[in-house]
């Protein structure tokens, strides 16, 4: 007789038909809240409706219901993303010069939008080359399409339709998993299973399928394109997949199929899975064979990682065990209890994810120019500048969001009674030391970084250039940064002998790569000017961290307001009779942090824009002489504040200011309009609520006189609402102003 362990019972992890589908709720704005559902008495109602519509915590305290709402909303978000993506591909198919660009990417600009001839605005359709008139785009889609092997507009149409189908599918999934088969709380908390599926499925199989697409479709098509074959002559993607002989003509080892893989003779595949480093001199992008190799390697790593965690089979890691074992001699209970926090507080989970994703997005910004991944991306200066700026802004917002949700976690989900002597408790107990030290660092960095500039401005104003900090007077060379550059430049001979070139040309050592007479990339020299602005970066980032971290660590209590947790995440003041307690809520710290995030990112993108125009981007003559856009003026001019104002902001704003009457005039209008939006924000930020309430009451009096007063009583925005509207317009106005300034400049000179 065989003794077998009893079969594990299959756990039912969904509830069937938990909530009936009804459109009646749609007709009842605010149905999620008893107060808001009553309808408006005052105009504050519409603001509360918007503030609370997605604040699922305030609608129910049932964690399972909150989880289901968030899960369902994610499908809605994915649906919108697919819809947007479909629109991008449709524009490429219907309104773009993609096929013309593909035939001559160095002389023809990418355009996917043609303005209708109404009120004379067809002036905006500039000549992008090849006889096509339209708006030059800087999103990088053309370069991605070429890299993925798209050769005609029909393929773009098909992809656009495919994305629409997926958008519909996601909408359906959002409805289905809330109304028909809603997951139980246990399913959302099963982190090992989630890790396995996300690592092996999303990242592992996702990377593997992309690597497969690159090898079987992108590489052969790009090989033909680089050789100058007419796109119409190139076999279609499915022909490469179905007919191995076609691929074997380009890569002979394909004739052997999978034999080398199973006989461990992997070097046979080195034709299309390379380890070259550097850039392809034809396109100025990374070698696509390097990229395919990278995705294959990443896929293996994630497929292994997706089998590491313990689920039904009793082998593998358990996250709870890992966290609880993680303690050192000086950290008390270490990470004990963190598992419970992260499986019951989605704010804590989201906070970590936002912090990591934000940092990763900023890493992406820096890799897009130093290791340009797509063909002809590096020589499209407008796209390079846009991609860097875009990813920097996104990263900044995500990191502030991380602090916001960390603070919401502290206020709503943190239970101090169950936490003792773990890392979080220890950090909270010595928060005064952390914040006061951080404050000292900010003061030190602020005075010293700005002080170096003020010294230079003073010496420059007094006509004493020999006493300035610059490469030609008192040098402050960034020796550590230069050492890192050299280490990487020498890596192919030393630490990475398999590579022929270092990871990025920017490290130094290598020659420049030019495509079609334009510089793609070259070694980037760092000097005193970079040393100075680097310390401004350090200063602004530390101040942002100070504000955000103070908001998180003092979200529940402070010496000023010991019971802050009872007042909630956002509140204007600690009630009447408590002077000097306004603007101390966790929300207010996020509000202030946003301004410093804006400062930080602005300095970074200004530094990038000027540095690249001065020391990297430009044209190259037949004799090999490089002429940079601003002629290398960064090293001398950017060492004074006056230099930044005069030689960067003012000198480079001439294109946007003089754009009227040209195809760039839309940027001139946006520059003006965005300045106005920015200035409009100051009206909300620099005035008090009482002022507006008094004004409104006068206006209501006039309406009553004329018997046209509305039933809904007008009210001034609350203090928090006013600041929210203010910071929104400040950021949108500032970002749109910068966008217009950058693009008008780089499209005109790039």
Curated annotation (Swiss-Prot):
The keyword Iron-sulfur applies. It is found in: Plastid, Chloroplast thylakoid membrane. Phylloquinone binds at residue 692. Coiled coil: none annotated. GO terms for molecular function: 4 iron, 4 sulfur cluster binding; chlorophyll binding; electron transfer activity; magnesium ion binding; oxidoreductase activity. [4Fe-4S] cluster binds at residues 573, 582. It catalyses: reduced [plastocyanin] + hnu + oxidized [2Fe-2S]-[ferredoxin] = oxidized [plastocyanin] + reduced [2Fe-2S]-[ferredoxin]. P700 is a chlorophyll a/chlorophyll a' dimer, A0 is one or more chlorophyll a, A1 is one or both phylloquinones and FX is a shared 4Fe-4S iron-sulfur center. Chlorophyll a' binds at residue 675. Keywords: 4Fe-4S, Chlorophyll, Chloroplast, Chromophore, Electron transport, Iron, Iron-sulfur, Magnesium, Membrane, Metal-binding, Oxidoreductase, Photosynthesis, Photosystem I, Plastid, Thylakoid, Transmembrane, Transmembrane helix, Transport. Its main location: plastid. Its EC number is 1.97.1.12. The keyword Glycoprotein does not apply. The PsaA/B heterodimer binds the P700 chlorophyll special pair and subsequent electron acceptors. PSI consists of a core antenna complex that captures photons, and an electron transfer chain that converts photonic excitation into a charge separation. The eukaryotic PSI reaction center is composed of at least 11 subunits. Belongs to the PsaA/PsaB family. PsaA and PsaB bind P700, the primary electron donor of photosystem I (PSI), as well as the electron acceptors A0, A1 and FX. PSI is a plastocyanin-ferredoxin oxidoreductase, converting photonic excitation into a charge separation, which transfers an electron from the donor P700 chlorophyll pair to the spectroscopically characterized acceptors A0, A1, FX, FA and FB in turn. Oxidized P700 is reduced on the lumenal side of the thylakoid membrane by plastocyanin. This is Photosystem I P700 chlorophyll a apoprotein A1. It comes from Morus indica.
């Amino acid at each position: 007789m065989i003794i077998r362990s009893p079969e594990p019972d299959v756990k039912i992890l969904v509830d069937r038909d938990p909530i009936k589908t009804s459109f009646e709720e749609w007709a009842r704005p605010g149905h999620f809240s008893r107060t808001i559902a009553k309808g408006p008495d005052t105009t504050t109602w519409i603001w509360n409706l918007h503030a609370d519509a997605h604040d699922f915590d305030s609608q129910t305290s049932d964690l399972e219901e909150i989880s289901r709402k968030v899960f369902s909303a994610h499908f809605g978000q994915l649906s919108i993303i697919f819809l947007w993506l479909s629109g991008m591909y449709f524009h490429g198919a219907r309104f773009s010069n993609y096929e013309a660009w593909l035939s001559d990417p160095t002389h023809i600009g990418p355009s996917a939008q043609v303005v209708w001839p109404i009120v004379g605005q067809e002036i905006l359709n500039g000549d992008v080359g090849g006889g096509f008139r339209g708006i030059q785009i800087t999103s990088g889609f053309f370069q991605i399409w070429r890299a993925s092997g798209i050769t005609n507009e029909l393929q773009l149409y098909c992809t656009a339709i495919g994305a629409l189908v997926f958008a519909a599918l996601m909408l359906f999934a959002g409805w289905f998993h809330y109304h028909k088969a809603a997951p139980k709380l246990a399913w959302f908390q099963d982190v090992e299973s989630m890790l396995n599926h996300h690592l092996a499925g999303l990242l592992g199989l996702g990377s593997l399928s992309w690597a497969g697409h690159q090898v079987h479709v992108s590489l052969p098509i790009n090989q033909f394109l680089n050789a100058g074959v007419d796109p119409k002559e190139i076999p279609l993607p499915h022909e490469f997949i179905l007919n191995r002989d076609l691929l074997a003509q380009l890569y002979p080892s394909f004739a052997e199929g999978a034999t080398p893989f199973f006989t461990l003779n992997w070097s046979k595949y080195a034709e299309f899975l390379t380890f070259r480093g550097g850039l392809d001199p034809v396109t100025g992008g990374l070698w696509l064979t390097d990229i395919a190799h990278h995705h294959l390697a990443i896929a293996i790593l994630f497929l292994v990682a997706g089998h590491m965690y313990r689920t039904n089979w009793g082998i593998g890691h358990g996250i709870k065990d890992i966290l609880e074992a993680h303690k050192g001699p000086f950290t008390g209970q270490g990470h004990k209890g963190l598992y419970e926090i992260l499986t019951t507080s989605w704010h804590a989970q989201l906070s970590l994810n936002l912090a990591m994703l934000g940092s990763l997005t900023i890493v992406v910004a820096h890799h897009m120019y130093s290791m340009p991944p797509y063909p002809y991306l590096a020589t499209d200066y407008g796209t390079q500048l846009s991609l860097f700026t875009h990813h920097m802004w996104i990263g900044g917002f995500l990191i502030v969001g991380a602090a916001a949700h960390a603070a919401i976690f502290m206020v709503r989900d943190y239970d101090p009674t169950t936490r003792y002597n773990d890392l979080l408790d220890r950090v909270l107990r010595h928060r005064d030391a952390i914040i006061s030290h951080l404050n000292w660092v900010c003061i030190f960095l602020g005075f010293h970084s700005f002080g170096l500039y003020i010294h230079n401005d003073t010496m420059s104003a007094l006509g004493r250039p020999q006493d300035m900090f610059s490469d030609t007077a008192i040098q402050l060379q960034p020796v550590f940064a230069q050492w890192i550059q050299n280490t990487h430049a020498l890596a192919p001979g030393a630490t990475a002998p398999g590579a022929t070139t270092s990871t990025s040309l920017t490290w130094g050592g290598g020659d420049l790569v030019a495509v079609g007479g334009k510089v793609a990339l070259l070694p980037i020299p760092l000097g005193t000017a970079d040393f100075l602005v680097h310390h401004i970066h350090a200063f602004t980032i530390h101040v942002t961290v100070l504000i955000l971290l103070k908001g998180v660590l003092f979200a529940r209590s402070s010496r000023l307001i010991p019971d802050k947790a009872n007042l909630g995440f956002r509140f204007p003041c600690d009630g009447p009779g408590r002077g000097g307690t306004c603007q101390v809520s966790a929300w207010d710290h996020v509000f202030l942090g946003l301004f410093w995030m804006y400062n930080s990112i602005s300095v970074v993108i200004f530094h990038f824009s000027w540095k690249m125009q001065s020391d990297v981007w430009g044209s190259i003559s037949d004799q090999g002489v490089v002429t940079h856009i601003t002629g290398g003026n960064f090293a001398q001019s950017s060492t004074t504040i006056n230099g930044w104002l005069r030689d960067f902001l003012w000198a480079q704003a001439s294109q946007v200011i003089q754009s009227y009457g040209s195809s760039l005039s839309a940027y001139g209008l946006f520059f003006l309009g965005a300045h106005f939006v920015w200035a409009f924000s100051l009206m909300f930020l620099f005035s008090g609520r009482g002022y507006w309430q008094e004004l409104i009451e006068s206006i209501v009096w006039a309406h009553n006189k004329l018997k046209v007063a509305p039933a809904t009583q007008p009210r001034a925005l609350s203090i928090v609402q006013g600041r929210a509207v203010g910071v929104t317009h400040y950021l949108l106005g500032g970002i749109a102003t910068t966008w217009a300034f950058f693009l008008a400049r780089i499209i005109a000179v790039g």
